[in-house]
Amino acid sequence: MYISDPSETKRPARQRDAERTRAAILTAALNLFSTRGFAQTGVREVAELAGVNSALVGRYFGSKLGLYRATLEVIDITPALQGDLRSFGKFMVGVFFDSPGAPGPLQMMILSMADPDAHAATVEFLQKKVITPLARWLGPPDGEGRAARLNILWTGFLISWKLLPIQSLTGARLAATRRWLEAQTQAIVDEGTA
């Protein structure tokens, strides 16, 4: 008969399960927050979509707001800031177009604006994790102003394409709009090199 040694643990498997569970919850939350918003999404719905017990949402994230904040943290602009300034417009617009059916962080943020706590979390996140790093990367002159203008440009486009779809943003017109958005994005970036 084999008696297990207490030093032999199964923690790595449990840890992998915990990581997988946490990731499933975050994926489900991103999907629901970006299609329904914060106020219209329940913890039970997130858990059901993730295939887990709803108590695990509280265990991993503390609250629905904690889950929302963690979902925001999944959004990371820093990989986009590793590239060349001269091709940033093409690269960044490609990010928007490469997965058009995926749940989007912008939709999640906009649809969650009605809730005061989610609104505050979104504004804080946007400034700290998007505008400030983008401004620092753009550098002088007026990196913060240029970062804000890029955010305005991208937000306006994504709202018109995803949330309040303009019918003429399809087919060849969408391709032309993509080229325009790339050029406008690059023009704002290039203001610092003129």
Residues covered by each model-derived region:
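Membrane-embedded alpha-helical bundles of multi-pass transporters/translocases
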Residues: 3, 43, 59, 89-90
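Short alpha-helical scaffolding segments that buttress acidic/His motifs in well-ordered protein cores
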Residues: 92, 106-113, 150-158
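Hydrophobic alpha-helical connector segments
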Residues: 77-110
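Amphipathic alpha-helical segments used for helix-helix packing
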Residues: 97-132
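Short hydrophobic/aromatic patch on the recognition helix
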Residues: 50-61
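Basic, helix-initiating cap at the start of DNA-binding domains
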Residues: 1-36, 40-51, 65-66, 76
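Alpha-helical DNA-contacting segments of helix-turn-helix folds
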Residues: 59, 70-75
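Hydrophobic/aromatic-rich alpha-helical bundle segments in the mid-to-C-terminal region
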Residues: 119-124, 136-194
